[in-house]
């Protein structure tokens, strides 16, 4: 298997996508943040002192998707045509599940943007709640769907 981000001399490079066709592309990523039940209850009730945790995390995730190429060296700057971050509060398992759907029409996919959006949304939740719960765990961040481009559809069984 050849790594596309490595040149003939073994050095890092940004892949040239100029000859690729523009296609409609979408990526879906998910992740979770586990916390104490009291923390989850307070997020749900809106009693975290720093403000509306999920609203801030949603905006942070969208901003992160838009700025992925500034954080991941070999990512291309992409015009994102849509980004949605959603949250599901799971009281039974004391966690918040996070989902990011990112869309574009372009020459390269938005997988890294979706993964970055989920990660930064989770980090934002952690940041806003760390004063009351330093035991939070961010985990299970993964790409679950990718469509468009030459490689077509990818779906992970979850």
From Swiss-Prot:
GO process annotations (BP): Mo-molybdopterin cofactor biosynthetic process
Gene Ontology MF terms in the entry: cyclic pyranopterin monophosphate synthase activity
UniProt EC number: 4.6.1.17
Entry superkingdom: Bacteria
Keyword terms, alphabetized: Lyase, Molybdenum cofactor biosynthesis
Known catalytic reactions: (8S)-3',8-cyclo-7,8-dihydroguanosine 5'-triphosphate = cyclic pyranopterin phosphate + diphosphate
Residue numbers annotated as active site: 127
Pathway the protein contributes to: Cofactor biosynthesis; molybdopterin biosynthesis
Residues that bind substrate: 74-76, 112-113
One Pfam family linked to the record: MoaC
Quaternary structure annotation from Swiss-Prot or TrEMBL: Homohexamer; trimer of dimers.
Biological role stated in the UniProt entry: Catalyzes the conversion of (8S)-3',8-cyclo-7,8-dihydroguanosine 5'-triphosphate to cyclic pyranopterin monophosphate (cPMP).
Entry's family note: Belongs to the MoaC family.
Xref: PANTHER family: CYCLIC PYRANOPTERIN MONOPHOSPHATE SYNTHASE, MOLYBDOPTERIN COFACTOR SYNTHESIS PROTEIN A
Protein name listed in UniProt: Cyclic pyranopterin monophosphate synthase
């Amino acid at each position: 298997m050849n790594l596309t981000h490595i040149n003939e001399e073994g050095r890092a490079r940004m892949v040239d996508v100029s000859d690729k066709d523009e296609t409609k592309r979408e990526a879906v990523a998910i992740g979770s943040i586990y916390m104490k039940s009291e923390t989850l209850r307070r997020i749900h009730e809106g009693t975290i002192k720093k403000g509306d945790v999920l609203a801030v995390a949603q905006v942070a995730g969208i901003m992160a998707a838009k700025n992925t190429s500034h954080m991941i060296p070999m990512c291309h700057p992409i015009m994102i045509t849509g980004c949605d971050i959603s949250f599901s509060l799971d009281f039974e398992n004391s966690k918040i599940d996070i989902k990011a759907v990112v869309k574009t029409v372009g020459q390269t996919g938005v997988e890294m943007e979706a993964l970055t959006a989920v990660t930064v949304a989770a980090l934002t939740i952690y940041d806003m709640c760390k004063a009351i719960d330093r035991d939070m765990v961010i985990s299970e961040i993964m790409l679950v769907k990718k469509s468009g481009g030459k490689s077509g559809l990818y779906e992970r069984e979850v």
